[in-house]
Amino acid sequence: MSRIRLAARALRLALNRAHADPTADYDAASSDYDTFFSPVMGGHSTAALAEVPIAPGDRVVELACGTGHLTAEIIRRLDGKGSVRAIDKSPGMLDVARRKVEALTEGRPGLDVRLFVDDMDAFIRSQPDRSADLVVVGWAICYTKPTRLLAEIGRVLRPGGRIMVIETRADAHQALTEGLEKVFADDPSLLTSLIRVSLPKNAAAVAGWFGKAGLTVTGQRDGAQVIPAHTPAAVLEWVQRSGAAAGFKTAVDNGRQQLVLDRVEAALAELLAREGSLDIQHTFVVVTGAKPVAPRARHGARTGEEAGVA
């Protein structure tokens, strides 16, 4: 019965368009992100970026750049020549990224790197057709309507241009999310807005999004990383200070956030006592792709894209 009440509560919130905005949580996590998230998951991000070619002179767009972990790696691989347009909705995260970028671009006039506080969907819609060689989306496509965003990315990519997406999987932090669901099921009034995310089941699901958007998949894989937190208190600290729980503050009744955290911690303590360990996994997917090159027209005619016609 409690889960039915929770479902009814969620439906009412959805009908009223009560959606949690994760920006405040990312702002709060910005000073700790490179202490908690980047050392654990940053290596997976860098490995994913290595799966797409980047050459000096490339034009790169990075959506949701966060604290600039991948932005810095992109700049290094451009080797002194090229452009980067990186955006994030969180001013706090972008401030950290900007400091990294300034250190890497000083005295290198061949690099044109600009950072903007902006929404992913709005920014990509503002970009010209066929204006990017590579688009990178790290840990953030879940906050959009993925197929629609990917279709816009396809428009912005030049023919043959590449895309890399790394994203958290739907089964990540399973013990934690199950504990949170139980807390909300026991008292649905604690939930005041919905955290709207489209986390994929697996890499095949993201590959399906690519296909629907007209992009060719060049690689796909699933991965997992055990987070370095093995007590209930440490788990809760990691997910809050790493940004993994972004949206929590605005999703929970103001003034009862600590109550929710205490109840989740108790649920994790029960799991630890029952199982003997807390191995919380951050599962993720990596999918790379490309915009198909337009086939050559017969009899020597040029296609619209080859002729430069939008």
Question: Where are each of the predicted segments found?
Answer:
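Conserved Class I S-adenosyl-L-methionine
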Residues: 2-18, 67-69, 198-310
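Conserved class I S-adenosyl-L-methionine
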Residues: 2-56, 69-73, 93-96, 100-103
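A structural alpha-helix within SAM-dependent methyltransferase catalytic domains
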Residues: 49, 72-75, 150-154, 181
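Class I SAM-dependent methyltransferase SAM/SAH-binding core
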Residues: 59-125
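Short glycine-dipeptide loop
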Residues: 80-81, 157-162
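A short acidic, Gly/Pro-enriched loop at the edge of an enzyme's catalytic core
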Residues: 125-135
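A short SAM/SAH-binding and catalytic strip from SAM-dependent methyltransferases
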Residues: 134-147
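Conserved catalytic/acceptor-binding region of the Class I
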Residues: 148, 154, 162-230, 246
